[in-house]
Amino acid sequence: MKKTKSAPERNTKTAKKNPHHADRTINILIVGVGGQGVLLASQILSEVALLAGYDVKKSEVHGMSQRGGVVSSHIRIGRKVYSPLIPSGQADVILAFERAEALRWIHELKPDGFLIVNDQQLVPPIAGDKKYVYPENALEILSARLKSLRVVDAARI
């Protein structure tokens, strides 16, 4: 029988002592395609926040992840979080593991939100369909629309 690992408990002692805990909920959206580590990154971030004493809620969509499909994870961190889903247009941070996914999800970012995007281009299997056009200029479009954008060559990290 396979043992399953349970999520860490919220560290309530830290939560009470830490004066830096925000009174508001921080909304982080991690997006990419299957196999990039979106689910692992969201799990690590959630566990670290729990251990730091925050309340954390997380929701994932990974239906076609094994076939290079879209993968997304909503992570909400705060003193008390009631829902795992980030309200539309209210992401404080979007961490995009792929350029086109950054462009696909940019409407979920707050006007003063911050986008971190990997400079990687992964053309999905659907690109073989002549109706699909991969946005070659995704970074230029994002740069023109956002004040807070950081492009990272994650393969070098």
Where are these regions (language model features)?
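Active-site cofactor/cluster-binding pocket
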Residues: 2-5, 13-157
